[in-house]
A protein has these predicted regions:
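A generic structural micro-feature
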Residues: 19-23, 98-105, 122-125
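Short connector loops at helix/strand junctions that flank enzyme active sites
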Residues: 24, 44-46, 51, 78, ...
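A short coil-to-beta-strand element that immediately follows conserved catalytic motifs
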Residues: 77-87
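Nudix hydrolase/Nudix homology domain
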Residues: 47-48, 118-163
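Active-site-adjacent beta-strand/loop module that shapes the phosphate/pyrophosphate-binding cleft
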Residues: 87-117
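Conserved Nudix-box catalytic region and its N-terminal flanking loop in Nudix hydrolases
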Residues: 33-73
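Acidic, metal-coordinating catalytic segment for phosphate/diphosphate chemistry
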Residues: 1-28
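Short, well-ordered beta-strand micro-motif
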Residues: 31, 108-112, 129
Length: 163
């Protein structure tokens, strides 16, 4: 079960900062099964299909954040993760549907080992399923194709992607 928005680090910071632009540090995770299908979640806030992702909380590492988000949004337990891309910079600034602006710093992780059964509906999701890349549903978050393309490059070069 996830913590409430008001109790989250970003929620508490937003309450103090008002409408000022905030830095948002988060993680995104790519979970694949043996046939190569990718796990996507359908977000309950905007209906988009996306990779499991979310904000880092005080007291956890960025890898812990990825593991926690996978658990909260899919029910799976990520046993081993490795970072493959960092997304930073002012071009990563986003205003959400509530009018709050964030400059986003995201670390993308490959989940190398996991166990459990997918929970299709959670506090943050309305669905979660594995899809072949050529059969992704709409509406699809713009971060999905970019992240998967970067994972492909990482797996060919073994070099961290910096954007």
């Amino acid at each position: 079960m996830s913590i409430s928005w008001a109790d989250s680090y970003v929620g508490q910071l937003r309450a103090l900062a008002g409408d000022r632009t905030l830095m948002f540090v988060g993680a995104r995770a790519v979970v694949r099964e043996n046939a190569g299908r990718v796990l996507l979640i359908q977000r309950s806030d905007n209906g988009q299909w996306a990779l499991p992702a979310g904000a880092m909380e005080l007291g956890e590492s960025i890898a812990d954040c990825a593991v926690r988000e996978v658990r909260e949004e899919t029910g799976l337990r990520a046993l081993r993760v490795s970072a493959f891309a960092l997304y930073t910079g002012p071009d990563r600034t986003h205003t959400n549907m509530y009018g709050h602006t964030y400059q986003i710093f995201t670390t993308a992780f490959r989940v190398e080992d996991w166990d459990g059964e997918v929970t299709r509906v959670t506090d943050e999701t309305t669905d979660a399923r594995f899809f072949h890349r050529d059969q992704f549903p709409a509406p699809l978050s713009a971060s999905v194709p970019e992240t998967l393309a970067d994972l492909d490059v990482f797996e060919q070069t073994n070099r961290l992607i910096l954007k």
